[in-house]
Amino acid sequence: MKIIFIGDIVGKQARETLIKKIPDIKSKYVSDVIIANAENSAAGYGLTKKIAVQLLESGVDVITLGNHAWDQKEMLSYIEECPKIVRALNYPEGVPGKGFYELELNDGRKIIIVQVMLRLFMESARTTKNAHLS
């Protein structure tokens, strides 16, 4: 199984470049799945619905988030509509979205993508438990 993970798309230029290149990357490396961390794709402040749709339509299979998950308030509802967007698994109960996604590949195999947020020089997932409410 070939998995391509694209780490931290930051801002418009990186996002637009990736969207253009994804089809070539997918065919060149004959990948089974492409996972992209897009928590900084909206100018370094989270992810928007529009950007998520663009990434998924370009060929990204699953999007992961991080500590900027709630910077764009529209994600509070959209993350419930789009299970291919994965927030931290270790957020407390009641936080919108899920921390994992089970993806069935074209050949019937399944892969589970899990996102866990740890901390180093930043707030813990526990102290940000109500960030989605502010």
Q: Where are the model-predicted features located?
A:
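Acidic, metal/ion-coordinating pockets
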Residues: 1-134
